[in-house]
Each structure stands twice: as structure tokens, then as C-alpha cells.
């Protein structure tokens, strides 16, 4: 495995780290007024922080992602996949760990090391379940800010994220404009559309109508795996595109020559979705899906951007944006990215925009693509050179 990692120009063996914050008597005050603490944050870092502490980049992961952006864990087997953006983050890559210090944390409410509904409630000794307070994208970002402060980083070179990670990235730009030189939102939106909310509601209902959900109190017993698998199947369709599904599956049959005239998986696309759903239940928590999809549905910064003027929070003169969309993304279509660009320009922002032609749908930003790598490399190099001259 070590030779494979070296040949792949990977960051190599990495380790998940943990930081506990918002402890009594200073819990985090959430947007809805609830208090939460202590909070444990799982995170990973790659590269080295410069002496000037001016090369730090925060990457925000998507809905079901985690802090494992690149590299391998020491416990990985030879067939284990590297981090989810390994093609983009590493030595000499688009986000170059020989030049930049990369940070990624698991979001609040998730289930991959950061406090969420599956975590133990210190007051009861049991899992929070639905006693976990409703959190927003803003609350996730406020938690990340505590981590960045803990790491002693006064200002980030860039904040980058795709999909739900792009929402976090935009929230960072609004909440803490003085904390970053640049912002790169990818395949994202200023607010969830009715279409996106509708798909999330179907996913939530799939879980909440599973007889094993038990109003969220399923820890230590049978989990709502069927509902979670169906929720993932629904979500996965939104991550693809008509073109991608026609190219990959068409109407091809799954390991058979004739239709079964029953309810087996006759078509390859049926088998694929069942596989994706069943795989998901082994790595994700159903309650976390409920909380994160709801946080995404609540996300809406249109008014906050549109009311920003020359004296307000989005107008730090040195802050630059690179907005990226994908032509076949029907979850967050390019028109939504263009709306974001227009809103940012109206508020006096320095904005670059690129639509990448792809038939891979919403998840295209997670697929190796030289065009994305070149965009990242060039934009970040320009930002870093600019601040080095200050």
C-alpha cells in the first residue's frame, strides 16, 4: 500500500484529530436560541502552516461527506479508497499541500466524529437522538470558526466547498468576511429550491415511516436501515444526470437476458441504486440525515446578500470569489450559480465564474477533472501571490 500511495502523489498516511469546545459554562448558542455543548469536532489537516500563517485553506465537505479529504488511514486495506478529494488535494495537485495548509472538519450534526444525534448526551449518558437541537448551516460554520481559532489561524487564504459544503463556504463569507482572502463555492446555491426541499422531504419520510425509526430512539437496537437506504437511493438520483444515467445504464438488464416479470432488479440502474442504498447504511446515521437535510432546506442567504451595500459585511475589498457550476447539475443548476454571481457583483464583490461542461450531474465536482484542477491551481496561486506582496 505504501508504494501505491507514493506513486499516487498522495498526502500519504493521515490521522483524524479531535477538538472539544463549547464546554460548560460556555456552550454554543445556536441560531434557534438553543444551547449545545460540549461539542467534539473531528478534523484532518494536510501540509504545513507557514510561519506567517497565511497559507491555510478550509475545505467544507458535502452532505454525507466527512473530514477525510485526502490520503489513507494507517488501518486502510490495500483496496480502500483514499479521501474523497484525493485527486485534487495533495503534493503538486490543484490544491497543493506542498504550498498550502489544508483543514477539513466533519460538520455539526453529522456522524463521522463530530457531535451529532448519535453522540452521547453528557446530561443523560445516552445518545441524543431527537433531543439533539436543530442546527443550521450557520451553526455548522460557527463551530468551524471555533476550530480555526483553536488552530491559531488569524485569516484563511481560502474557504472552499461543494454542494452543502458550498453553502457553508458562502455562510463563512457572510459571517466572517474578515477571516478569508478568497471564497470558492462549487455546485451550490444561495437557497434551497422547492425541488431540492421536495427531494429532501421524500428522504426524510422514507426514514421516519420505517417501523424501526422509533422517533429517533433506535440506538442499541434495530436501525431504520430500509428507510435510510431508500433515502439514499432518492438522493443519489439527484446527484446524477439524465445524460450520465443513459450513458452508464440505459435500459441494460442486470445479469440476465430476459425480463423477470416480477419485482427483482431487472435493470442495471435498479441494481445500482439498491447497492448504493445498502452501502450507505453501513457508514451513515439516519438521524444525521434528517438534521442535515433540514439544515440545507433552511439555508437562505438571498436577503442577506441582496441587502449588502458598500458599508456592509460582504464588501471587504480584498475578498475574491471563484464561483463554479456544472452544466448538467439539475439539483443546483447553473442559473442558480449565475444568480449568486449577480448578487455578489451587485454588492461590489470581485467575482470570477466558470461553468464546467460535464454530463456527470451534481456530483461532477467529486470526479477527477483537469479543468477543475486547473481552475483551483490558477486562482489560488493568484491569491497567494497577491497576499505575499502585501
From Swiss-Prot:
Substrate binds at residues 232, 363. It is found in: Cytoplasm. The keyword Zinc does not apply. The active site is at 163 (nucleophile), 329, 362. One of its GO terms (molecular function) is homoserine O-acetyltransferase activity. It is an enzyme of class 2 (transferase). Keywords: Acyltransferase, Amino-acid biosynthesis, Cytoplasm, Methionine biosynthesis, Transferase. GO terms for cellular component: cytoplasm. Its EC number is 2.3.1.31. Residues 55-366 form the AB hydrolase-1 domain. It comes from the Bacteria. Pathway: Amino-acid biosynthesis; L-methionine biosynthesis via de novo pathway; O-acetyl-L-homoserine from L-homoserine: step 1/1. One of its GO terms (biological process) is homoserine metabolic process. Pfam families: Abhydrolase_1. It catalyses: L-homoserine + acetyl-CoA = O-acetyl-L-homoserine + CoA. PANTHER family: HOMOSERINE O-ACETYLTRANSFERASE (PTHR32268:SF11). Homodimer. Belongs to the AB hydrolase superfamily. MetX family. Transfers an acetyl group from acetyl-CoA to L-homoserine, forming acetyl-L-homoserine. This is Homoserine O-acetyltransferase. The gene is metXA.
Amino acid at each position: 500500500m505504501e508504494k501505491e500511495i507514493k506513486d499516487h502523489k498522495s498526502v500519504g498516511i493521515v490521522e483524524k484529530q479531535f477538538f472539544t469546545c463549547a464546554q460548560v459554562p460556555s456552550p454554543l448558542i445556536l441560531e434557534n436560541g438553543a444551547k449545545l455543548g460540549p461539542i467534539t469536532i473531528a478534523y484532518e489537516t494536510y501540509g504545513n502552516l507557514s510561519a506567517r500563517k497565511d497559507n491555510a485553506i478550509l475545505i467544507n465537505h458535502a452532505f454525507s461527506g466527512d473530514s477525510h479529504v485526502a490520503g489513507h488511514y494507517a488501518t486502510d486495506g490495500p483496496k480502500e479508497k483514499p479521501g474523497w478529494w484525493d485527486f485534487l488535494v495533495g503534493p503538486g495537485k490543484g490544491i497543493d499541500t506542498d504550498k498550502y495548509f489544508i483543514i477539513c472538519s466533519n460538520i455539526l450534526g453529522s456522524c463521522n466524529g463530530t457531535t451529532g444525534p448519535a453522540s452521547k448526551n453528557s446530561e443523560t449518558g445516552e445518545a441524543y437522538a431527537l433531543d439533539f437541537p436543530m442546527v443550521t448551516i450557520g451553526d455548522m460554520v460557527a463551530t468551524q470558526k471555533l476550530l480555526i481559532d483553536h488552530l491559531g489561524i488569524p485569516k484563511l487564504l481560502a474557504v472552499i466547498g461543494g454542494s452543502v459544503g458550498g453553502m457553508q463556504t458562502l455562510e463563512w463569507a457572510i459571517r466572517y468576511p474578515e477571516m478569508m482572502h478568497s471564497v470558492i463555492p462549487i455546485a451550490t446555491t444561495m437557497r434551497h429550491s422547492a425541488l431540492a426541499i421536495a427531494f429532501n422531504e421524500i428522504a426524510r419520510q422514507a426514514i421516519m415511516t420505517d417501523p424501526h425509526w422509533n422517533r429517533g430512539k433506535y440506538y442499541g437496537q434495530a436501525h431504520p436501515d430500509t428507510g435510510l437506504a431508500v433515502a439514499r437511493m432518492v438522493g443519489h438520483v439527484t446527484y446524477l444526470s439524465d445524460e450520465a444515467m443513459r450513458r452508464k445504464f440505459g435500459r441494460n438488464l442486470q445479469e440476465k437476458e430476459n425480463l423477470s416479470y416480477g419485482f427483482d432488479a431487472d435493470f442495471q440502474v435498479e441494481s445500482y441504486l439498491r447497492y448504493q442504498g445498502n452501502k450507505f447504511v453501513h457508514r451513515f446515521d439516519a438521524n444525521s440525515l434528517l438534521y442535515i437535510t433540514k439544515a440545507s432546506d433552511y439555508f437562505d442567504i438571498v436577503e442577506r446578500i441582496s441587502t449588502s451595500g458598500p458599508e456592509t459585511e460582504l464588501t471587504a475589498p480584498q475578498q475574491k470569489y471563484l464561483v463554479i457550476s456544472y452544466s448538467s447539475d439539475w439539483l443546483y443548476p447553473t442559473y442558480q450559480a449565475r444568480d449568486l454571481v449577480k448578487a455578489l457583483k451587485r454588492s461590489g464583490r470581485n467575482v470570477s465564474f466558470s461553468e464546467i461542461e460535464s454530463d456527470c450531474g451534481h456530483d461532477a465536482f467529486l470526479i477527477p477533472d483537469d479543468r477543475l484542477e486547473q481552475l483551483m491551481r490558477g486562482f489560488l496561486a493568484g491569491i497567494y501571490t497577491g497576499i505575499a506582496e502585501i
